[in-house]
């Protein structure tokens, strides 16, 4: 298990990150959990690197807002929350370091409901089902008829930002992590992607050989290695990164986060295919 204070966190491999013990650059990873494939972007939480975090928001299907249980909601936490609202990103909340926090779950939930939304709900509490049943009329009617929360209606409510599931635990002690991972799978709204090709650029980087990499999320259709993008550029390689390591694939499908080698003209926020360009809000 990698630890920031041991300078061996899997995604914080940059020398500056290991020296300072914080995330500076957004990183990608992908993995399987219970027959589902998850594409993860780990972003900085420090206020000095807000722009790096914001660039990643535009390609997220779901955000996990990580809050230190010792500190609770800080001013920068509220800023990130406003960004998530601006980009209309469905959000789960994980309260970390509960093994050493002097605050109770009830105290932290009161803070979340006061500062963020009354629809922040502790999914492991005894009152969770009652709170969920009152999210909207459709969920309530189904609950009154069946005494169960309809999973598809709940997914839609989370997708529409009508509900913000909250989980508590400790990453270091591996407490609450399985509940969070299950929630990512069970509560995510499955999107339908168009058949036409589209992608969104969220990051530009260079590899160890100095090759320019254009990091994108595929939002429709498929992209093959050697395909032309735009009028005069060709994708030489499609890379799937896991931290510092990567594998090359022949085809990228909708929902994938990948890095494209061979493109030199695209910048952060630009769209490929049917996607239009976006402007960032610059927090």
Regions found by a protein language model. Give the residues of each.
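P-loop NTPase switch module centered on the Walker A-proximal segment
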Residues: 1-59, 63-67, 73, 116, ...
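Active-site phosphate-binding and catalytic loops of NTP-dependent enzymes
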Residues: 2-25, 118-123, 150, 186-197, ...
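Short beta-alpha junctions and helix-cap segments that line functional grooves
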Residues: 13-14, 27, 50-53, 76-81, ...
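Residue-level signature of catalytic and energy-coupling elements of molecular machines
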Residues: 21, 42, 56, 64, ...
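Surface-exposed loop and edge beta-strand positions of immunoglobulin-like domains
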Residues: 41, 67, 169, 216-219, ...
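P-loop NTPase catalytic nucleotide-binding module
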Residues: 69-208, 227-229, 258
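Conserved nucleotide-binding/hydrolysis modules and their immediate coupling elements
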Residues: 187-188, 194-279
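Conserved small/polar residues in nucleotide/adenosyl-binding loops
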Residues: 281-283
């Amino acid at each position: 298990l990698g630890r920031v204070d041991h300078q061996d966190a899997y995604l914080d491999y940059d020398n500056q990150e290991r020296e300072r013990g914080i995330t500076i650059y957004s990183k990608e990873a992908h993995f399987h959990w219970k027959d589902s494939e998850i594409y993860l972007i780990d972003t900085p939480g420090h206020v000095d690197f807000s722009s790096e975090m914001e660039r990643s928001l535009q390609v997220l299907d779901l955000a996990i807002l990580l809050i230190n249980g010792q500190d609770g909601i800080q001013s920068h936490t509220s800023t990130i929350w406003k960004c998530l609202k601006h980009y209309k990103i469905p959000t789960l909340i994980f309260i970390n370091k509960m093994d050493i926090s002097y605050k109770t779950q009830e105290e932290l939930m009161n803070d979340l409901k006061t500062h963020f939304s009354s629809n922040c709900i502790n999914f492991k509490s005894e009152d969770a089902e009652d709170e969920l049943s009152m999210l909207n009329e459709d969920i309530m009617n189904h609950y009154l008829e069946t005494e169960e929360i309809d999973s598809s209606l709940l997914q839609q409510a989370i997708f529409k930002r009508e509900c913000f599931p909250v989980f508590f635990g400790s990453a270091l002690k591996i407490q609450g992590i399985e509940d969070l991972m299950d929630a990512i799978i069970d509560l995510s709204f499955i999107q339908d992607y168009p058949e036409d090709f589209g992608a969104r650029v969220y990051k530009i980087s260079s590899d160890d050989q100095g090759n320019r990499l254009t990091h994108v999320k595929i939002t429709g259709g498929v992209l093959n290695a050697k395909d032309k993008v735009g009028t005069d550029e060709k994708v030489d390689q499609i890379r799937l990164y896991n931290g510092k390591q990567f594998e090359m694939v022949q085809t990228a499908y909708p929902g994938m986060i990948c890095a494209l080698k061979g493109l030199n003209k695209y910048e952060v926020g630009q769209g490929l295919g049917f996607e239009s360009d976006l402007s960032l809000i610059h927090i």
